[in-house]
């Protein structure tokens, strides 16, 4: 028994990683046949069930245009789970899980389909969902308004505050990025969503915030006395936040062209990482306190010299992992005159006492040297008074590198004496890796986030204020690029971006860290 919920016979009592268990509920997926649902969302729900973190009566509903029966849907979910789940497939768990699965056939404008969805949820309520429904919109943003309007028209949404009502239960909605394509569209989207659901019932998914290492930024900073006194402009020279991918755009040309790297990942993932890295200690880990501190940082972000504070690139043909790969313009459906960037680097500052004078460099790109996401806090150089000039100017510059993916952990770089009779100094690394230090396996990001939605715990989900502040930071760049028709510079696939990105740091007598 946990918090008054029914005991779950499928829960492994030895699993101590997440002790919170969702109460009676049902989860409805719009866009259930898409890649994200098939590869990430459905396996994550199964993994939660497999770990005993969902109730036996849990309901899972797919909504889509395919002419499927409930059994067809179950077969699709099983195939997805067997191919992509993190935890082993167990027949006893599956038999329990599939009993709560239903499929509703219909288009997003189909009133009859939404009535069928309503009756399906009523049936699941009688089975044990108790009126608690979460709607996951894994669909293009242009379809949000239509789906939300239908949910409201058919009595499936609620404007009541998101508290558990013993009679009617709760209603929540989950939306995936992009949250608009600029500040104006983000405000329009927020007004549409919050006209149907109250703000605290809206969960904007940024899967990066569900990663163990991202949450560990808070633990590392605020539970260790050794780091926080140094976490300011007196000691920190600059901060680099990198999200590098080794793949191209693949089959996403229709989505990616016209969006680009800055809108795709800097506006959300990287600015959220910046906020967590730079924020002040919150009063508590409650959502309102965390969000308040993140919003203060985003509000303080400044662009000091816009024409010299960015670099844009498009990948050209080259070699990746020893294989020849195509360039951006060789991909299907990319127009020859496209100015969409596949690489973007930005320089910003934060106008507050802690970070005054410390630049933050953000970069994201495709077809780079390797897949890696990291936050590198680079400290000011120590005095050369005792040890003389260093041959390499970067030697002696301490760093704390937080690795978000793929090998989650942290590296501290510091100087040490080389063994021998000479006083020779060399940089060395001290590593912490989740896989080496803990026997528990980290939950997949979507596991944590879906569980938080069902529990109604929003600390890891950005509110509309954070989304709008992020667009306020990016919009001046996007407008400048459009007004001046900036053409991204080609860079070879497998490299670390265009020459202009390196020149941006060289102007500041700095260099990008090689991840």
List PLM regions with ranges.
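Secretory/organelle targeting and membrane-embedding segments
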Residues: 1-175, 179-515
